[in-house]
């Protein structure tokens, strides 16, 4: 009976197959690919921030253009045109703050296959940054802290330069104290 509906052959075929638990079907993300994805994420966030800033200002301007305001009466003691201009700038600022949320969502959708590995690599990268960064208590105008959070590291050369800058900061802090 099992042979008639095809279950018998399927169950025998799955038993005979060897299963490898220690390897995954995907290759691991290397540091160059991770840093390229990090750069792409940052650029997408900046572009979406610019777009949402303009959209927020436009939406605020559209709303203010449709309401009736008496131009001869001050609003909170200020000229109504100044208040409206400030509201448009405030709307653009709020839109700018929403940009990274949209940019990160777009980045996640675009790189859905590599997101799990990207997050793992990001945690490892942040642990490396935390381990190698300098103590900012000895900074001065002549000896500034080199990129405390590692936000501008987008290539291996940037990372190596950041490590050299951290070592130079430590050396200068030790010599001048």
Curated annotation (Swiss-Prot):
- Organelle transit peptide: 1-22
Q: What is the lineage of its organism?
A: Eukaryota, Fungi, Dikarya, Ascomycota, Saccharomycotina
Instruction: State the superkingdom.
Output: Eukaryota
- The protein's name in its UniProt record: Presequence translocated-associated motor subunit PAM17, mitochondrial
Major subcellular location class: mitochondrion
Species of the source: Debaryomyces hansenii (strain ATCC 36239 / CBS 767 / BCRC 21394 / JCM 1990 / NBRC 0083 / IGC 2968)
Kindly list the places in or outside the cell where this protein is found, as annotated in its UniProt entry.
Mitochondrion inner membrane
Q: Which PANTHER family match?
A: PRESEQUENCE TRANSLOCATED-ASSOCIATED MOTOR SUBUNIT PAM17, MITOCHONDRIAL
Q: Provide the function of this protein.
A: Component of the PAM complex, a complex required for the translocation of transit peptide-containing proteins from the inner membrane into the mitochondrial matrix in an ATP-dependent manner.
The text of the family note is: Belongs to the PAM17 family.
SUBUNIT field: Component of the PAM complex, at least composed of mtHsp70 (SSC1), MGE1, TIM44, PAM16, PAM17 and PAM18.
What's in the GO CC field?
Answer: PAM complex, Tim23 associated import motor
Q: How does it sit in the membrane?
A: Multi-pass membrane protein
Q: Which Pfam families match?
A: Pam17
Q: Which GO terms describe its biological process?
A: protein import into mitochondrial matrix
Per UniProt, the keywords (alphabetical) are: Membrane, Mitochondrion, Mitochondrion inner membrane, Protein transport, Transit peptide, Translocation, Transmembrane, Transmembrane helix, Transport
**Transmembrane segments annotated in the record for this chain:** 44-64, 82-102
């Amino acid at each position: 009976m099992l042979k008639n509906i095809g279950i018998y052959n399927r169950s025998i075929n799955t038993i005979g197959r060897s299963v490898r638990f220690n390897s995954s079907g995907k290759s691991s993300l290397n540091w160059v690919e991770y840093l390229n994805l990090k750069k792409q994420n940052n650029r997408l966030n900046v572009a979406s921030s610019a777009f949402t800033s303009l959209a927020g200002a436009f939406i605020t301007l559209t709303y203010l253009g449709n309401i009736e305001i008496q131009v001869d009466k001050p609003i909170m003691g200020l000229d109504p045109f100044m208040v409206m201009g400030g509201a448009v700038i405030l709307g653009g600022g709020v839109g700018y703050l929403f940009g990274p949320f949209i940019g990160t969502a777009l980045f996640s959708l675009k790189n859905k296959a590599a997101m799990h590995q990207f997050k793992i690599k990001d945690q490892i990268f942040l642990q490396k940054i935390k381990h190698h960064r300098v103590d900012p208590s000895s900074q001065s105008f002549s000896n500034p802290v080199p990129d405390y959070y590692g936000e501008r590291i987008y290539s291996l050369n940037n990372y190596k330069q950041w490590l050299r800058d951290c070592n130079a900061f430590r050396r200068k802090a030790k010599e001048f104290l």
